[in-house]
C-alpha cells in the first residue's frame, strides 16, 4: 500500500468523526455530572461557617469543619472554643467494623450456599433458589417492624445480638445473601467439574476440593461480593437507625443525620463527615479493583 493510500485509509468519514465527538461530549457530561456533587461537598466542607450555598471554589479556606470531624476542638479569633459536636471518628470506626464483619460473613455464607446449589443435587433446589430471590426483592423497609420485634425478643436471650448492639445490625445485614448466592453460583457453574474430580481421585475430600481448588479460582467473584456487601453495609441507614439507639453506637451513615437538626443545619460539618465516609469505600475499591471487572462479567454467565 502506497503512502497516499494509507493516508486515505486513515481519513475518517465525517459522520464517524461527528459520532466520535458526540460520544466524547456525552462522556465528559457524564463525568461532570458525577464529579460536580463531590466537588461541591468538598467546597462546603472548606468554607467558613455552615452554609450550603456558595461558589465551587471557596473565597477563603477554613479547616474548622475538618478539625471538628476529626475530633479536635476549634479555637476562634475571639478566644472561644468549639468542641466537636459529635464523635465522628467513633462513628466511622463503627461503620468500618460492622461493614468488614458483615462483608466477610456474607462472603463465607454465600460461598458455601452457592457451592451446595451449584454442585449438589437435592430435592427442592430450584424452588428454594427462586424463593430466596423473590424474598430478596422486597425492600428492607417493609420488614422494619418485624426486625425490631425479632431483635427485641432475641436480645432477651442473647444480649450481644439484641437491640442497640452492633452484633444485631451485623446479624440483620447477613440475612440479605440471596442475590450474592445466585451470583457466586453462576460463577461456580463456569468452572469445569473435572478439576474437582481430579482432586477427588488424588484423595481430596469434598471440603478440600472446595477449599483448595474451587475457592482459589473464584477470587474475582468473591472480591465483587465483598465490595458490594461492604458498600451496602457502610451506607445502610433504615435498619441501623432502627436497631441502634445509643449515640456512641451509631454508624456514620446514621450519625450524620444529627447534623441536620431542623433548628440548626450544620452543613459544613456534615460535608466534612460525608467526605470522610467515602474514604473506606474508596480504599476497599482501589485494593480490589483488579478483580472487579472479571468477577462481574464471569459471575453473570449462566451455567
Curated annotation (Swiss-Prot):
Keywords: Cell inner membrane, Cell membrane, Membrane, Sugar transport, Transmembrane, Transmembrane helix, Transport. SUPFAM superfamilies: MetI-like (SSF161098). The keyword Mitochondrion does not apply. Pfam families: BPD_transp_1. Residues 1-19, 119-130, 183-211, 289-303 are cytoplasmic. It is found in: Cell inner membrane. GO terms for biological process: maltodextrin transmembrane transport; maltose transport. The chain crosses the membrane at residues 20-42, 96-118, 131-150, 160-182, 212-234, 266-288. Residues 92-288 form the ABC transmembrane type-1 domain. It is a multi-pass membrane protein. GO terms for molecular function: ABC-type maltose transporter activity. GO terms for cellular component: plasma membrane. Residues 43-95, 151-159, 235-265 are periplasmic. InterPro entries: BP-dep_ABC_trans_perm, MetI-like, MetI-like_sf. NCBIfam families: PRK10998.1. Part of the ABC transporter complex MalEFGK involved in maltose/maltodextrin import. Probably responsible for the translocation of the substrate across the membrane. Belongs to the binding-protein-dependent transport system permease family. MalFG subfamily. The complex is composed of two ATP-binding proteins (MalK), two transmembrane proteins (MalG and MalF) and a solute-binding protein (MalE). This is Maltose/maltodextrin transport system permease protein MalG. The lineage of its organism: Bacteria, Pseudomonadati, Pseudomonadota, Gammaproteobacteria, Enterobacterales. The gene is malG.
Amino acid at each position: 500500500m502506497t503512502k497516499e493510500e494509507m493516508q486515505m485509509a486513515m481519513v475518517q468519514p465525517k459522520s464517524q468523526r461527528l459520532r466520535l465527538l458526540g460520544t466524547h461530549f456525552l462522556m465528559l457530561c457524564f463525568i461532570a455530572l458525577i464529579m460536580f456533587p463531590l466537588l461541591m461537598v468538598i467546597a462546603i466542607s472548606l468554607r467558613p461557617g455552615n452554609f450550603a450555598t456558595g461558589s465551587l471554589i471557596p473565597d477563603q479556606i477554613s479547616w474548622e469543619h475538618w478539625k471538628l470531624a476529626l475530633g479536635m476542638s476549634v479555637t476562634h479569633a475571639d478566644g472561644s472554643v468549639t468542641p466537636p459536636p459529635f464523635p465522628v471518628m467513633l462513628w466511622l470506626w463503627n461503620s468500618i467494623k460492622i461493614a468488614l464483619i458483615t462483608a466477610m460473613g456474607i462472603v463465607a455464607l454465600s460461598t458455601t450456599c452457592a457451592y451446595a446449589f451449584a454442585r449438589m443435587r437435592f430435592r427442592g433446589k430450584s424452588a428454594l433458589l427462586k424463593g430466596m430471590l423473590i424474598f430478596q426483592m422486597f425492600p428492607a423497609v417493609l420488614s422494619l417492624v418485624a426486625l425490631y420485634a425479632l431483635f427485641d425478643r432475641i436480645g432477651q436471650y442473647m444480649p450481644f445480638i439484641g437491640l442497640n448492639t452492633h452484633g444485631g445490625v451485623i446479624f440483620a445485614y447477613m440475612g440479605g445473601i440471596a442475590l450474592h448466592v445466585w451470583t457466586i453460583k453462576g460463577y461456580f457453574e463456569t468452572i469445569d467439574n473435572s478439576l474437582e474430580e481430579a482432586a477427588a481421585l488424588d484423595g481430596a475430600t469434598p471440603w478440600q476440593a472446595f477449599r483448595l481448588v474451587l475457592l482459589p479460582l473464584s477470587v474475582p467473584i468473591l472480591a465483587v461480593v465483598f465490595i458490594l456487601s461492604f458498600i451496602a453495609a457502610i451506607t445502610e441507614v433504615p435498619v441501623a437507625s432502627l436497631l441502634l439507639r445509643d449515640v456512641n453506637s451509631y454508624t456514620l451513615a446514621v450519625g450524620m443525620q444529627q447534623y441536620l437538626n431542623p433548628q440548626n443545619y450544620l452543613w459544613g460539618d456534615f460535608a466534612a463527615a460525608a467526605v470522610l465516609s467515602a474514604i473506606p469505600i474508596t480504599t476497599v475499591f482501589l485494593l480490589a479493583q483488579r478483580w472487579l471487572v472479571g468477577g462481574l462479567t464471569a459471575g453473570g454467565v449462566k451455567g
